[in-house]
Amino acid sequence: MKKFLVLFFAVTASVSAQDFDKKKIVRRLAKIMNENYVYPEKGKAMHDLIISKLKSNQYNSYDSESAFAAALETDLRSVTGDRHIRVTHDHAHAENIRNRDFGPGPESNGKFGFEEVKILPGNVGYLDLRGFMDIGIAEDVAKPAMDKLIQADALIFDLRKNGGGSPNMIRFISSYLFGDEKVHLNTFYWRPADRYSETWTDPELASQTKPDIPIYVLTSDYTFSAAEEFTYNLKNLERATIIGETTGGGAHPGGPSIISGDFVVNVPRGRAINPITKTNWEGVGVIPDIKVPAEKALEKAIELAKLELNK
């Protein structure tokens, strides 16, 4: 029995050491970023930086997986400033990726990101949206919510606790907010496929459209990614008043890749290109029309909505 235990622990240690092979992890990560990051020159710069640090033994001091992952993330971000880049060591996350099961998100409580849907006094619709879930998953919640809200005389979209999600939910919601003509919302460039994709509203998705209803979007410095796209789209189309704080500044969508073992990197493979500005909000965020602390944004929006409706 004693020999068995010694052998068991030896094998376990061997597997653990193999999973934490720094050379393998760095070389694989460098290759992933070089071949996939949306800007090739920055992908190469990240590759060169971490390979150089590996060769000069600068990663030798990291003896835990989580600390090593954090160091790699810091190094990659030092080149790009891209907050969509994330390096983690997480067994459950890695297994979900292998199984194409990305785990619980805003849908796990059955609300699919639609945290609160209500009509405020004065017939002002209010949506506290915590995530832009894929419409294919969330339609049974999203459609009744928007069908209810579009009956209001003004709308408030609260994105202060929204970290992003899917462009097709942006398209779905936006389709209620314009007229019968399709509106170009956004374009994405995807480096790995070297292709462009466009997002347009589709009036047929909405039970009713109200192109003139006053819209207010609430933001915070937590508002990120797809939540920023929704905000940026409506701002530049002059379709909404943005109230709150400058957003987080993430305009490079992508997805996770297994590096080795349970090490995972989120790789920004694309970039948003707004059809009006010809650029995006990466690194700068979306600047609100009316700057107030996030906690005061709802109060300000209600005030403005009442003034607008009482004209």
Please annotate each region the language model reported.
Residues G165-P214, H252-I259, R269-P275, G285:
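Gly/Ser/Thr-rich loop/hinge elements
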Residues H91-A94, G131-I135, K161-P167, V183-H184, ...:
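Solvent-exposed loop/turn segments at secondary-structure junctions
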Residues L127-G131, A152-G163, L218:
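Short acidic catalytic loops
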Residues E116-E139, I276-T277:
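STAS-typified acidic loop motif
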Residues P40-G122, K311:
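Extended, small/polar residue-biased N-terminal targeting/export presequences
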Residues L29, L76, L127, F157, ...:
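Terminal peptide-recognition signature
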Residues M1-F20:
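Bacterial Sec-dependent N-terminal signal peptides
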Residues I135-D153:
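A short, well-ordered alpha-helical element
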